[in-house]
């Protein structure tokens, strides 16, 4: 199926908060079920990249939806449960560090997005994807929106689902791999994480050997 990529919006003209305007415009064009799609975890040294697709019920949109990075952990958690209870459909997909190393983070992210869109229990008629890129082989048309999580409440909802899901995964990983502080930094390259890597070394299957600073030091693993 071909995909429509509209002219990307002016990122310097963001709304005060995400809204449902893009979705309403698409619904007027005949696209009833609009999926917002976002990712979390492109940059960390450890853990998966997680994507989510969310189709909101326009009559039950939770108050306060916003880019997950702009919300406190407590507010994200509250909205996470509100989205779970009110959305028409939610799908989550993740790809592990080893898969990221075998392809690259961009390809892995797009593949995870493709999987979560295709995994929606209510098939999407259209997808709004955060960022510049659109996955291939989608079951519906799609548009990429730069800073989409600050424009579309559907994308904002997806960012919250993906963020809370990934944080929970990394908290579980922290219980298994003691000493790395994964439950605190969730895999990002903090000073504490770098110090733990110096002390213990990376964990195969958890850490991304294709990412600096691991890439140069563990080049043999990647060969």
UniProtKB/Swiss-Prot annotation:
Binding site for a divalent metal cation: 38-39, 130
Superkingdom per UniProt: Bacteria
Catalytic activity: Endonucleolytic cleavage to 5'-phosphomonoester
EC number: 3.1.26.4
Classification via InterPro entries: RNase_HII (IPR022898), RNase_HII/HIII (IPR001352), RNase_HII/HIII_dom (IPR024567), RNaseH-like_sf (IPR012337), RNaseH_sf (IPR036397)
GO biological process: DNA replication, removal of RNA primer; mismatch repair
PROSITE patterns listed in its UniProt record: RNASE_H_2 (PS51975)
Subcellular localization(s) per the UniProt record: Cytoplasm
Cofactor binding summary note: Manganese or magnesium. Binds 1 divalent metal ion per monomer in the absence of substrate. May bind a second metal ion after substrate binding.
Any Gene Ontology CC annotation: cytoplasm
Cofactors required: Mn(2+); Mg(2+)
Gene Ontology MF: a single term: RNA binding
UniProt xrefs under CDD domains: RNase_HII_bacteria_HII_like (cd07182)
Membrane-spanning intervals of the chain: none
Alphabetic keyword roster: Cytoplasm, Endonuclease, Hydrolase, Manganese, Metal-binding, Nuclease
Domain spans labelled RNase H type-2: 32-223
UniProt function note: Endonuclease that specifically degrades the RNA of RNA-DNA hybrids.
Family: Belongs to the RNase HII family.
Xref: NCBIfam families: PRK00015.1-3
Official protein name in the record: Ribonuclease HII
Species of the source: Bartonella henselae (strain ATCC 49882 / DSM 28221 / CCUG 30454 / Houston 1) (Rochalimaea henselae)
């Amino acid at each position: 199926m071909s995909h429509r990529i509209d002219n990307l919006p002016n990122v310097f003209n963001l709304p005060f908060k995400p809204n449902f305007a893009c979705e309403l415009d698409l619904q007027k064009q005949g696209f009833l079920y609009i999926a917002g799609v976002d990712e979390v975890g492109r940059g960390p040294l450890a853990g998966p990249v997680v994507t989510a697709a969310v189709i909101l019920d326009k009559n039950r949109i939770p108050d306060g939806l916003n880019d997950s990075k702009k919300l406190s952990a407590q507010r994200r958690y509250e909205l996470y449960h509100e989205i779970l209870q009110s959305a028409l459909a939610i799908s989550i997909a993740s790809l592990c560090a080893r898969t990221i190393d075998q392809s690259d983070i961009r390809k892995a992210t797009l593949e995870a997005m493709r999987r979560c869109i295709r995994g929606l229990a209510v098939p999407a008629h259209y997808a709004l994807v955060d960022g510049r890129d659109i996955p291939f082989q989608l079951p519906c048309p799609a548009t990429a929106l730069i800073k989409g999580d600050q424009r579309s409440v559907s994308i904002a909802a997806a960012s919250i689902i993906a963020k809370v899901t990934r944080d929970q995964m990394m908290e579980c990983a922290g219980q298994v791999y003691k000493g790395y502080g994964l439950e605190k930094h969730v895999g990002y390259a903090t000073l504490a994480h770098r110090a733990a890597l110096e002390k213990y070394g990376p964990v195969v299957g958890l850490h991304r050997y294709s990412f600096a600073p691991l890439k140069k030091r563990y080049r043999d693993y990647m060969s």
